């Protein structure tokens, strides 16, 4: 049987995008008799932050940087290539401190920097709120590329996150990675979309701009696949679950259902007063 610590750790690790603070508040309320339990969950918070590519703004900085296992240094510090800095990070409070200069050195330095430059143009064009990074890994023999985009709309009861991770191998110009989408909708219900798309590709040029371009092509293709899947679900499986007449005894224009606010427009009035 799992211990209380293991159970609570699973709550932290499974927190939906943008809702970790809410999960922590619930944990505090549920474990008020053991107030020190939260301080024992450091490994769970670290796993969440690194796997979810949590972003943080450095003191004095304007752009978010990524927390990941690929950007990790020793003693709880992380680094960012674009700002040439390293920093301490508190996984529980999600705050950065003690920013220091960090100059990247190694065989893949030029490739990493050119990849970051290529990613900058791509991300700024296609994502309204995103962070990106490239890091040498596996004894400087490969390059990890990370992109994360968050969209939080708690007033409309939904939050979402796009995460993509790619490993580029210069020895054969190959890219292997995955794109993960996590969306949580929780107005008068609890629906969570989780997707995981495996990506394999080749960068014939072997350059940073070529890596960014190949990533762009694959992510655009996956976005189109997602859009088609949503349309197929709406017109197929979901349509078969719909009532001919809902409990309101009024027919619903299902082709416009995406524009309805659940609990308000469907119910014919405000769901919260």
Curated annotation (Swiss-Prot):
Output a single Gene Ontology CC term carried by this record: cortical cytoskeleton
Q: Which UniProt keywords apply?
A: Actin capping, Actin-binding, Cytoplasm, Cytoskeleton
Q: Record's family?
A: Belongs to the F-actin-capping protein alpha subunit family.
Q: Answer whether the UniProt record assigns the keyword Cytoplasm to this protein.
A: yes
Q: Which PANTHER family match?
A: F-ACTIN-CAPPING PROTEIN SUBUNIT ALPHA (PTHR10653:SF0)
The record describes the protein's role as:
F-actin-capping proteins bind in a Ca(2+)-independent manner to the fast growing ends of actin filaments (barbed end) thereby blocking the exchange of subunits at these ends. Unlike other capping proteins (such as gelsolin and severin), these proteins do not sever actin filaments.
In the UniProt record, what gene is named as encoding this protein? fac-1
Native source species: Neurospora crassa (strain ATCC 24698 / 74-OR23-1A / CBS 708.71 / DSM 1257 / FGSC 987)
User: What's an example of a GO molecular-function annotation for this chain?
Assistant: actin filament binding
Query: What GO terms in the biological process aspect are recorded for it?
Result: actin cortical patch organization; actin cytoskeleton organization; barbed-end actin filament capping; mating projection actin fusion focus assembly; mitotic actomyosin contractile ring assembly; mitotic actomyosin contractile ring contraction
Q: Using the record, list the residue span of the signal peptide; answer none if the entry has no such feature.
A: none
* Descriptive protein name: F-actin-capping protein subunit alpha
Q: What is an example of a Pfam family matching this protein?
A: F-actin_cap_A
Q: Does the keyword Cytoplasm apply?
A: yes
* InterPro entries linked to this entry: CapZ_alpha, CapZ_alpha/beta, CapZ_alpha/beta_2, CapZ_alpha_1, F-actin_cap_asu_CS
What coarse category fits the chief subcellular location reported for this protein? Answer: cytoplasm
Q: Give the record's subunit note.
A: Component of the F-actin capping complex, composed of a heterodimer of an alpha and a beta subunit.
Q: Where in the cell is it found?
A: Cytoplasm; Cytoplasm, Cytoskeleton, Actin patch; Cytoplasm, Cytoskeleton
Q: Which domain of life is it from?
A: Eukaryota
Q: Which Gene3D superfamilies match?
A: F-actin capping protein, alpha subunit, F-actin capping protein, beta subunit
